[in-house]
Amino acid sequence: MKYEYGSVLAPIIKSFLDMKHGLGFKYESECKLLRRVDQSALIHELDDVVLTKEFVNDFIKKHANEKDINITSRVTIIRELAKYMNSQGYKAYIVPPLPRGSYHSTFVPYIFTNEELRKIFLAADQFASTPSLDNQYYHQRDKYPIILRILYSTGMRIGEVLQLKIKDINFETNAFMIQEAKNNKDRIIPVHPVTMKYLKDYITKKCIFDNEQYIFTNRNHLPITTRTVYGIFRKILHIACIPHGGKGKGPTVHSFRHTFCVHRLRDWVICGRNISALFPYLCAYMGHADTRCTEYYLRLTAELYPDIVIKSEKYFNEGADRDE
């Protein structure tokens, strides 16, 4: 459903939605919430494009018999809008995120060091070129060095990598098109030229030319399973002499995604990039439902690299003085 916005916030709300849609977010239920923001602005008789602390707190306050999930949804959307407004030069109070869910769980992702990554890629190459005694997997071992390199260089989910077809790859722009992935996010993934060359050589070697053909398949030409990749990855970790901490501790295949996000944020902070402006793009790139997941990685980045804590705190404190 298309909603009409009539308050003083209407132009910035429409601009915000254009930005989100342009990044591949469907933002359907969020449009309804933004309509409520617009209606609240009319009720409060706002005459300027600003989100005050009073306005925001009134918008997110809990009503009688209301479920927590509804409050969470309002907090999320008003935070997203406030961050966008700040990035566009408007004053907007950013309410602190709610302490709930996986973002505050005891789980700590495994983040690879640069040396561990070097060992893993060398071990993967060795695994691909060395036949096992029972010849298990040998006829298809050459796919795993490429899969692992794609995982780290793009931050994609393993399920997304295994669903890649020829039609999803653009060798001219060095990019993947991910459609209908988790959270219903369509997005374009830039790929490093070196990684793309590995992939192109593999595709040529395997004579994969049909647009509907999967890239990484088993002997039945079906996508290999995540379980298979996880099993092979444990073998590669063993070759690399990197211990596995056991169930729930890793490292796992998904650790490449965690590492990509943390390393990207680390590099941005070190280079002095505007984290506030870049955050929505990283969130869209990762396919996160909203910025809370990505914010968790920023906190983790600060914990792993204490020397950049001061720089990263600038992002968290942003908007604290913009509520008047």
Give short role names for the model-derived ranges.
Residues 1-324:
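Conserved catalytic core of the tyrosine transesterase superfamily
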